[in-house]
């Protein structure tokens, strides 16, 4: 069904990706306002960000397994309804505990939505277009960084911190309407059982793919987590220009997502290995380039491009190696990305606490990318060894 209907269905899913990407990052830009509005200090308000991430990590595997036999269209619609309601609720609470609960619930549909959405999108196009279809859903995240996050942050600062959550809820509602209208029933029926989904966890290649995401993306997050002080302290870019720098990063993400489909034609594992190698080199040089404002901005753009090529490739790889348990594996990919976020930021904080300077988080990131590259090479080698006896037997 690669037609106008497929395009509309993928667009509907991308709208959901845009809503999710906006709510995931907007809280970070409004921490002072949210802290004041809920009567806590800024460090405590950071828990709201952690609550959302925890919801992603916990919700993705649980929902994927429990919803294995349900029609995927029904599950996707239900996930977006829950997401929209939780975001609207986030704007109606003004104390710490209720907002923590609302943000946790808001995060729970995140991984399952992208995981199931990727499977649905891939089912609507020919096999050689699967990575492109997955990238088009994930591009919603990238566009959110360019448009959604800056706009809702501005509105939150000018009108009130609750407004962005209500806007995200409205976008989520629009996504629900679009999915009901445009997602085909026949292409989105889950055929896997509870045991089929869990069986994916017995496959070595699934764990290797998840490890690539955790370690490889940890390198990117170790750099991005400290991008603002890196730009102001090393590159000398004024703080007022940081939103522009972040928008350039978002444009890089869009470029990477669009490019991923073409890279996939070279082979999924070749693309993964090549992307990780490029990420490692880029991060190794990043700390030196950051001392020049022009080079710093160029490298921020590249920091958006290269990992965004890798995400759809990894998602496709998990579909290939999970066999019957594709729903769980695809959802777990987004749990690992949030784990990578925490891992990278933590390792970056260690070198900064040691007084090594803002050049070093990206160098730590380069080491993580090299480790991810090693895991990818191991995965490819094991894949060839497994395929060889089968071909000989045939």
Predicted regions and their residues:
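Paired small-residue
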Residues: 11, 82, 86-89, 97-106, ...
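Helix-breaking motifs and short loop linkers at transmembrane-helix boundaries and internal kinks
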Residues: 39, 71, 92-98, 236, ...
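C-terminal transmembrane helical hairpin of 12-TM major facilitator-type secondary transporters
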Residues: 270-314
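Cytoplasmic helix-loop-helix junction between adjacent transmembrane helices
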Residues: 102-140
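A late C-terminal transmembrane helix in Major Facilitator Superfamily
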Residues: 321-358, 365
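Conserved MFS/SLC helix-loop-helix module at the cytosolic interface between two early adjacent transmembrane helices
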Residues: 58-97
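C-terminal membrane-cytosol helix-exit motif in multi-pass small-molecule transporters
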Residues: 169-189, 375-379
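Helix-to-loop junctions at the C-terminal end of transmembrane segments
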Residues: 60-72, 256-268, 352-353
């Amino acid at each position: 069904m690669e037609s106008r209907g497929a395009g509309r269905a993928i667009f509907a899913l991308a709208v959901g990706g845009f809503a999710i990407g906006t709510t995931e990052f907007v809280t970070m830009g409004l921490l002072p306002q949210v802290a004041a509005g809920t009567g806590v200090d800024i460090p405590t308000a950071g828990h709201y960000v952690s609550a959302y991430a925890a919801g992603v990590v916990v919700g993705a595997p649980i929902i994927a397994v429990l919803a294995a036999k349900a029609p995927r269209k029904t599950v996707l619609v239900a996930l977006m309804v829950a997401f929209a309601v939780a975001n609207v609720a986030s704007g109606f609470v003004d104390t710490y505990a209720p907002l923590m609960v609302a943000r946790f619930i808001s995060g729970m549909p995140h991984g399952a939505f992208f995981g199931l959405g990727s499977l649905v999108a891939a089912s609507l196009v020919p096999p050689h277009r699967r990575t492109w279809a997955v990238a088009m859903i994930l591009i919603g995240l990238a566009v959110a960084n360019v448009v959604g996050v800056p706009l809702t942050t501005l509105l939150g600062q000018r009108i009130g911190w609750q407004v962005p959550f209500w806007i995200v809820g409205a976008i989520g509602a629009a996504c629900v309407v679009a999915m009901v209208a445009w997602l085909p029933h026949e292409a989105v029926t889950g055929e896997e059982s509870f045991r089929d989904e869990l069986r994916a966890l017995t496959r070595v290649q699934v764990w290797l793919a998840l490890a690539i995401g955790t370690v490889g993306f940890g390198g990117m997050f170790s750099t991005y987590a400290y991008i603002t002080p890196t730009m102001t302290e090393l590159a000398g870019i004024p703080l007022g220009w940081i939103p522009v720098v972040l928008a350039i990063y978002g444009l890089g993400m869009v470029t990477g997502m669009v490019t991923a489909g073409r890279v996939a034609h070279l082979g999924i594992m070749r693309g993964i290995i090549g992307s990780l190698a490029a990420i490692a080199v880029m991060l190794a040089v990043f700390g030196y380039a950051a001392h020049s404002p022009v080079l710093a901005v160029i490298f921020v753009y590249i920091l958006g491009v290269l990992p965004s090529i890798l995400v759809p490739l990894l998602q496709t790889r998990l579909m290939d190696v999970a066999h019957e348990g594709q729903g769980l594996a695809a959802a777990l990919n987004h749990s690992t990305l949030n784990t990578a976020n925490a891992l990278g930021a933590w390792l970056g904080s260690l070198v900064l606490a040691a007084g090594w300077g803002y050049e070093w988080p990206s160098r730590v990131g380069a080491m993580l990318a090299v480790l991810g590259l090693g895991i990818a090479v191991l995965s490819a080698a094991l894949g060839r060894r497994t395929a060889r006896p089968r071909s000989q037997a045939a």
